[in-house]
């Protein structure tokens, strides 16, 4: 998506899509209580979006958790720390705020609502901001959604030492439905456990999401990105989580399932012209 095509998204539309994504993740049991967070970056500024009408409290000069110079002049929406993602659809302004990034990227004007249900943005805001900045810097994306969630089957597999690698996790989740390789041709990059919100996790996530749309934070959750829509990012999670569900169920039944063979997956990839090096 080019930068010229992003400003047609109205503020109401952006908040509605964030809310819909939160509900879908909740239905997947991937965001228990206040877990999980969502951000969206767009090229539009406060005036184009009408931020002051929906989020009337402006806090200029708010320091960002890291410098994001590529985002200067852009707006980043982000969910609040401790907010339940399932509540966003019914009360978006209470659970989502927006930052319009200043020149230089060290600060921004933070737009909030008087009835906000949080004190600060999500504790993972550093990773969200870093991914947005890196993707804009490298690919000039005009719109991007980034989501962190904790899908139970994927997380469960990441607790298993013999599965906790990029090669093995992808082998396990790709073999249950032919659609999965089509939807996730690069698979999931698997990271070792790192402290949530840490500098190490942020840097590793930025690197992983350059070549993948989804990264596994072992024993914690996933982060996924989309250039089109928050729900498109959730779709990727749903495909991966379904594969993980089948794998867990197969393990519970003694590994009786054959799954889609590597040769069969290669045939699918050829038929749909899927560019992948996983097979």
Task: Describe each model-derived feature in a short phrase.
Residues 1-279:
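Glycine-rich flexible loops
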């Amino acid at each position: 998506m080019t930068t010229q095509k992003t400003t047609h998204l109205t503020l109401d539309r952006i908040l509605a899509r964030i809310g819909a994504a939160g509900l879908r993740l909740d239905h997947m049991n991937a965001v228990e209580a206040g877990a999980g967070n969502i951000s969206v970056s767009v090229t539009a500024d406060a005036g184009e979006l009408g931020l002051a009408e929906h989020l009337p409290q402006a806090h200029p000069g708010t320091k960002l958790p890291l410098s994001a110079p590529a985002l200067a002049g852009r707006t980043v929406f982000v969910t609040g720390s401790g907010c339940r993602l399932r509540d966003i659809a019914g009360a978006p302004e209470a659970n989502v705020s927006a930052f319009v990034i200043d020149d230089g990227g060290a600060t921004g004007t933070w737009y909030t609502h008087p009835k906000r249900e949080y004190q600060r943005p999500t504790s993972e805001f550093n990773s969200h901001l870093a991914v947005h900045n890196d993707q804009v810097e490298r690919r000039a994306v005009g719109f991007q959604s980034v989501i962190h969630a904790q899908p139970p089957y994927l997380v469960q597999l990441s607790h298993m030492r013999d599965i906790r690698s990029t090669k093995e996790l992808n082998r396990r989740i790709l073999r249950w439905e032919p659609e999965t390789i089509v939807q996730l041709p690069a698979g999931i990059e698997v990271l070792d456990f790192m402290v949530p919100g840490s500098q190490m996790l942020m840097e590793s996530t930025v690197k992983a999401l350059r070549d993948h749309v989804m990264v596994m934070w072992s024993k914690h959750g996933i982060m996924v990105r989309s250039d089109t829509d928050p729900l498109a990012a959730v779709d990727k999670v749903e495909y991966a989580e379904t594969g993980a569900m089948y794998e867990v169920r197969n393990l519970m039944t003694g590994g009786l399932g054959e799954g889609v063979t590597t040769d069969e997956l290669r045939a699918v990839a050829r038929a749909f012209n899927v560019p992948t090096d996983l097979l």
